[in-house]
Regions:
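Short alpha-helical segments that sit at the start of domains
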Residues: 24-47
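Short, functional N-terminal and low-complexity linear motifs
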Residues: 15-19, 29-35, 52-54
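Long, charge-rich, low-complexity alpha-helical segments
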Residues: 3, 7, 39-103
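Hydrophobic packing positions characteristic
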Residues: 1-21
């Protein structure tokens, strides 16, 4: 997926785990079960790192900053890869985007 501006998720967008899922750490991996579809999703590496932050609640900008602190990655590459990951998680109904922090 390209990261053209029509698909860019703003940095102040709050990312929240979809309520109808459960997840668990399995070593360095996160395993997510979507309760409506019964599908399991495995996240490794940076994906698992992002998922742990999403479970706690974070904005796109906070996620990007945390990735850059934890991993050695160029800013543009970080931004593009994060946008792609979040779009994929949203498409699979594993995350939701909100303008305000979740309550």
């Amino acid at each position: 997926m390209s990261s053209d501006s029509s698909r860019t998720i703003p940095v102040d967008t709050h990312v929240q785990a979809f309520p109808r899922q459960i997840s668990s750490e399995a070593g360095d991996e996160e395993v997510v079960l979507h309760l409506d579809t019964g599908q399991y999703h495995g996240l490794e590496g940076v994906g698992a790192f992002v998922w742990r932050l999403v479970r706690e609640g974070a904005t796109v900008g906070e996620l990007e900053s945390a990735i850059r602190r934890e991993y050695e990655v160029e800013p543009d590459r970080c931004r593009d890869d994060l946008q792609t990951l979040l779009a994929e998680l949203h498409e699979r109904k594993l995350v939701e985007f909100h303008n305000e922090p979740p309550r």
